[in-house]
Design a protein with these regions (language model features):
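Extracytoplasmic "Venus flytrap"
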Residues: 36-53, 73-78, 223
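Bacterial N-terminal signal peptides
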Residues: 11-22
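Contiguous mixed-secondary-structure segments that line small-molecule binding/active-site clefts
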Residues: 56, 97-195, 207
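Pocket-lining segment of extracytoplasmic ligand-binding domains
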Residues: 184-186, 195-227
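N-terminal export leaders
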Residues: 5-11
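Immediate post-signal peptide segment of exported/extracytoplasmic ligand-binding proteins
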Residues: 23-39, 59-67, 141, 164-176, ...
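Short, polar/charged alpha-helical segment
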Residues: 44-69, 183-187
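Alpha-to-beta junction loops
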Residues: 63-66, 82-96, 193-196, 210-218
């Protein structure tokens, strides 16, 4: 699960534009508002395509008012550094992992453990309901950002460099399994019987290729897109 975040100052600016519709057009004869977007997603990943749809929709809704700049592959900011970049005013929008939010808003660690969310419908119910809205509020207050929405990453599936019959935790003994860098995910990796290895998503494919790690448990569409 990932979340789309936007700087609060930008929300205020967008609201001001929306409310000032009655002003003369000359009042807005100014440069476009930059919207720098950072995501670790690769071009073929549907999360990257999501941002393209966002850009096209915004250009259609507010033509000429925003300069949307989509930075893929964590090329603008390394995964996990986006909140600090947003706080400094160097980034407006990002898809950020729940465990990176939990570093600044510990209450959000509720959503960093495995198997908390059953499926897309359950995720939507949780985050559209009182629990999710309260967590959004806490994160916004502590990080000075506005959480726009959650993004369903997919069902996590274990995949290894070498063929191995895995039926019990004992079958993963000695396997260096890449996990997200939160203590909850690392605990899950150990509970599965593997040697949990924290690694940013953007480094996973090369690490698999070189043997730095033996496996990972991302959704298969995400893995295929990153190849």
């Amino acid at each position: 699960m990932k979340l789309s975040l936007i700087r609060r100052s930008l929300v205020a600016a967008s609201a001001a534009l929306a409310l000032a519709g009655g002003l003369p057009a000359t009042a807005f004869a100014q440069a476009k508002i930059p919207l720098r977007i950072s995501t670790p997603a690769v071009p073929d990943d549907w999360h990257a395509k999501m941002w393209t749809v966002f850009k096209e929709s915004l250009d259609k809704s507010a033509p000429g008012e925003f300069d949307v700049q989509i930075h893929l592959n964590a090329t603008l900011f390394k995964q996990g550094t986006e909140p600090a970049a947003m706080a400094r005013g160097n980034l407006e929008l990002a898809t950020i992992s729940a465990f990176d939010i939990a570093k600044l808003a510990p209450e959000f660690s509720l959503f960093t453990a495995g198997y908390v969310i059953r499926d897309p419908q359950h995720q939507q119910q949780v985050f559209d309901g009182p629990i999710g809205q309260e967590m959004f509020k806490l994160a916004s207050e502590k990080m000075d950002v506005t959480v726009l929405s959650t993004i369903y990453l997919g069902t996590r599936q274990l995949n290894l460099r070498e063929v191995r019959n895995v039926r019990t935790p004992a079958d993963l003994k000695g396997v260096k399994l890449r996990m997200p860098g939160s203590k909850e995910w690392l605990f899950l990796g150990e509970a599965l019987g593997a040697t949990a290895t924290p690694l940013a998503f953007g480094e996973v494919y090369l690490a698999l290729k070189t043997g730095t790690i033996d496996g990972q448990d991302n959704p298969l569409p995400t893995v295929r897109a990153a190849k």
